[in-house]
Amino acid sequence: MNTRNTRSKQRAPFGVSSSVKPRLDLIEQAPNPAYDRHPACITLPERTCRHPLTDLEANEQLGRCEDSVKNRFDRVIPFLQVVAGIPLGLDYVTRVQELAQSSLGHTLPEELLKDNWISGHNLKGIFGYATAKALTAATEQFSRKIMSEKDDSASAIGFFLDCGFHAVDISPCADGRLKGLLPYILRLPLTAFTYRKAYAGSMFDIEDDLAQWEKNELRRYREGVPNTADQPTRYLKIAVYHFSTSDPTHSGCAAHGSNDRAALEAALTQLMKFREAVENAHCCGASIDILLIGVDTDTDAIRVHIPDSKGFLNPYRYVDNTVTYAQTLHLAPDEARVIIHEAILNANRSDGWAKGNGVASEGMRRFIGQLLINNLSQIDYVVNRHGGRYPPNDIGHAERYISVGDGFDEVQIRNLAYYAHLDTVEENAIDVDVGIKIFTKLNLSRGLPIPIAIHYRYDPNVPGSRERTVVKARRIYNAIKERFSSLDEQNLLQFRLSVQAQDIGSPIEEVASA
């Protein structure tokens, strides 16, 4: 799909250096064993794969964080396996509680255990509760981390403004492999002006985003935050699609049938529609900047589609960070930075299918350059922990729970949760359906229930906001139970309902389902 015009007789460059049109519409094929090693390092077998721009300290901290969070979830099933072998009867509750405290770090509600002598093991209920407790602990851990990184957030806001953006609104696919997009893949801290909402297939809600844009612009006008409305900065909307280089027709985007071309074009079309909506709904030159990013979920390397001088994007005009990684691996840090920024300019100068109208603005090029540099650390993160490519059990789906609603912005780790953003089940049924489909294979096939965390945020400054948010969470809870009644009747859906004030890091407040 070319958003500018059709050049049916011209060939498109592959990446930024080849004149061969990339195969976006892939045919059925088996996993490619040639990708067992990271493609950026495959030509350098004699060298340790460590890029000169990699932030080793950050990688170590992120690794410890990922291990500690996932370990809480991964302890649940081994705990249940031991519980299943404990004889039912008088000592059952005491033995299970002692085991829970030593294995999970907490005890269990008495009602999950007290009727064991007549009803047997309540393994499904215990699984749901233990998973919810692991999520609570993860949220608290990330909240502490966010509070300790306030200086990084302030620096990020300053960087956005220097690049000409007063807000950055990111809509990745809801796939759990993109759950760590901000802190890991892009290395961007959460700020009050960084918005992230995930949707199946990156198909974000244009009306919701238009309302977010209006709210942001009104705040600039009324409060001068983060800058005043007369400053020549823009609202940046980013859509993020994903693909798999090792198994493109099976491990790509589930919402688009693992069709890379469909995933890319759908995200690009949504971006164009959103920009048109802003321009049509508001006068006086109102508009936004848009950016499209692809993520290889095998390696976490990004592909950034470069806008031209008019802000138009093109499926074939991009910088592949796997290529820039290999090109700059042996250089000094300053030399590597120069090559990366030259790659952006070279993409803008592409001919054929990738040809655009001039180069992107200086601020946009600077922003893209920093994303590419940040992502080099993530490429090395995967190299150091997994040999350059995630193992087979993590290349596909390996989520621990379904997150429904506004999501837990604090908790962002790969393959931790499948995210379904919705206000009503009817409006976003596909998001929930895709999640249930994924967990049918992950959990139901093993006899495990599906943990569903329904979570919404409220504005504490608005009277009655919390009460209405609780009602909303309960309405969604009942709607999901009704939509998947056969699973619910078998106790195969384990719910946790909670609400939270809008401020990042605010306490999680669990609420009853009725």
UniProtKB/Swiss-Prot annotation:
A single GO molecular function term of this UniProt record: metal ion binding
Activity: how regulated: Carbonic anhydrase activity is inhibited by ethoxyzolamide, dithiothreitol, cyanide, and divalent metal chelators dipicolinic acid and nitrilotriacetic acid.
Entry cofactors: Zn(2+)
Region: C-terminal domain, residue numbers: 398-514
Subcellular location field: Carboxysome
Residues that, per the record, bind Zn(2+): C173, H242, C253
Record Gene3D superfamilies: Carboxysome Shell Carbonic Anhydrase, C-terminal domain, Carboxysome Shell Carbonic Anhydrase, N-terminal helical domain
Keywords, alphabetical: Bacterial microcompartment, Carbon dioxide fixation, Carboxysome, Lyase, Metal-binding, Zinc
One GO biological process term: carbon fixation
Chief place of localization: other
Record note on cofactor: The fourth ligand is a water molecule. Binds 1 Zn(2+) per monomer, in PDB:2FGY a second Zn(2+) is seen, but one of its ligands is an accidentally introduced mutation.
pH dependence, entry free text: Optimum pH is 8.0-8.5 for CO(2) hydration, and pH 6.0 for hydrogencarbonate dehydration.
Source superkingdom: Bacteria
Catalytic activity: hydrogencarbonate + H(+) = CO2 + H2O
Assembly: Homodimer, may form filaments.
Protein name in the entry: Carboxysome shell carbonic anhydrase
Protein's organism: Halothiobacillus neapolitanus (strain ATCC 23641 / c2) (Thiobacillus neapolitanus)
